[in-house]
C-alpha cells in the first residue's frame, strides 16, 4: 500500500468507531517523506508524501482510512532532556545553545519548559550553563517542534522574479 497524503488526525475522530492499526515511529522518522514501515497488524506500507507537513508527521496522523479501517501514526516514547527555564533570558540562552548544535527542540508541557532528544554532550552543556533539567521518557511530537529546518531538504515552494523586480514566493 502506498500512502501519498494524510487523511486527517485521530483527535478529530472518535477512534472507538474504527478499527485502528498503528505505525510505530521513532521521533526522527516522523520527518521522512519517503519510507517503508510495517503496522502493528503486519501490513506493509510505503509512504511517499507529496505535500509532507513542514514539521513532520504528528501523533495520530491518519495515513489510510477506508470505511471502518484506519492506519495512524504512533510516535514512540524516547529518552529526552526536559529543560525548565527560570526566565525569558534563560529561554533565549537555551534556544541559542540548542540551535547552535542543530538539535531538535520541542515545547514542553508548561510555560518555559522544553524538550530535546537525549545526547550526553547536550546534557553536559546544560549542566555547565546551570540550566535546570532532567532526563525522562517522553514523546517528541512534531506538532510541538520549535525548529523546522530540515537538513538536505528541498524547499516546497517556487521563487521567481516578478516584472517589478520583487521576489515572489509561491
From Swiss-Prot:
Keywords: Chaperone, Cytoplasm, Nickel, Nickel insertion. Pfam families: UreE_C, UreE_N. GO terms for molecular function: nickel cation binding; unfolded protein binding. GO terms for biological process: protein folding; protein-containing complex assembly; urea metabolic process. Its main location: cytoplasm. It is found in: Cytoplasm. SUPFAM superfamilies: Urease metallochaperone UreE, C-terminal domain, Urease metallochaperone UreE, N-terminal domain. The keyword ATP-binding does not apply. GO terms for cellular component: cytoplasm. HAMAP family: UreE. Belongs to the UreE family. Involved in urease metallocenter assembly. Binds nickel. Probably functions as a nickel donor during metallocenter assembly. This is Urease accessory protein UreE. It comes from Helicobacter pylori (strain J99 / ATCC 700824) (Campylobacter pylori J99).
